[in-house]
A protein has these predicted regions:
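P-loop (Walker A) phosphate-binding loop of NTP-binding proteins
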Residues: 22-24
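NTP-dependent small-molecule kinase module
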Residues: 2-8, 153-154, 168-206
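Short hydrophobic/aromatic beta-strand immediately N-terminal to the Walker A/P-loop
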Residues: 18-20
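Phosphate-binding P-loop
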Residues: 8-16
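ATP-dependent NMP and nucleoside kinases share a basic, alpha-helical "lid"
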Residues: 71-80, 94-151, 196
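ATP-binding Walker
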Residues: 27
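Short glycine-/polar-rich loops that comprise or flank the Walker A/P-loop
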Residues: 41, 127-132, 174-176
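N-terminal phosphate/diphosphate-binding loop that engages ATP/GTP or pyrophosphate donors
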Residues: 30-80
């Protein structure tokens, strides 16, 4: 049996896999995801829609798709979002069509969404693809707060708000399949890569 037919059988058993990576702002999710995608073939990043303002250095279509609230609400009404949430006044959503397109190429998809989005995705019931939930975070709120201050993109009040949200999000850990501690990026990348490799090798999903 060729490697191509073996891969096809794996797809037939479980189809594409959506790897949902959640965690607080400043946890290093983007950096870890980018590193893993540079190592592992067959992964595509799902670019979310958002109504929030673009930050310095961000690129439309790479980091997010930046749209008005009216456009976002129209996409939701048309059923174009797999999940969508509002976080600190800004809306975020995962486009359904992009996931379908990635799977049609025989690849797996990585989603960087918040805990509310993960909960909504999990509450959808039976999906036509497998979803693996990973929570990535530093080992303490003190480390997270320091990273947010060093990033310099938010006011002290906004940072306090994010830390409070993180405290609440930690209560949702039992909903996740894996926890990755990112105090050292190299270690976190190795762990995230190992998770993806293991899940791709899984024959049965209960």
């Amino acid at each position: 049996m060729s490697s191509e037919s073996i891969a096809a059988k794996r797809r037939g058993v479980g189809g594409g896999i959506a790897f949902v990576v959640c965690g607080p702002s400043g946890a290093g999710k983007n950096s870890a995801i980018e590193r893993v995608m540079a190592i592992l073939p067959g992964l595509s990043f799902s670019v979310s829609y958002t109504t929030r303002a673009r930050r310095s250095g961000e690129v439309d279509g790479r980091d997010y798709r930046y749209v008005s609230r009216q456009t976002f609400d129209e996409l939701v009404a048309q059923g174009e979002m797999v999940e969508h949430v509002t976080y600190l006044g800004d809306a975020y959503g995962t486009p359904r069509a992009q996931i379908r397109e990635v799977f049609s190429r025989g690849e797996d998809v990585v989603l960087n969404i918040d805990v509310k989005g993960a909960k909504r995705l999990k509450s959808c019931g039976l999906l036509d693809f497998a979803v693996i939930y990973v929570f990535l975070t530093p080992s303490s709120l003190e480390i997270l707060g320091q990273r947010l201050r060093e990033r310099g993109t938010e006011t002290p009040e906004q940072i306090r708000g994010r830390l409070e949200v993180t405290r609440q999000e930690m209560e949702a850990l039992p909903l996740f399949d894996y926890l990755v501690i990112n105090d050292d990026l190299d270690t976190a990348v190795d762990e995230l890569r190992a998770i993806i490799v293991a899940e791709r090798s899984r024959v049965r999903r209960d």
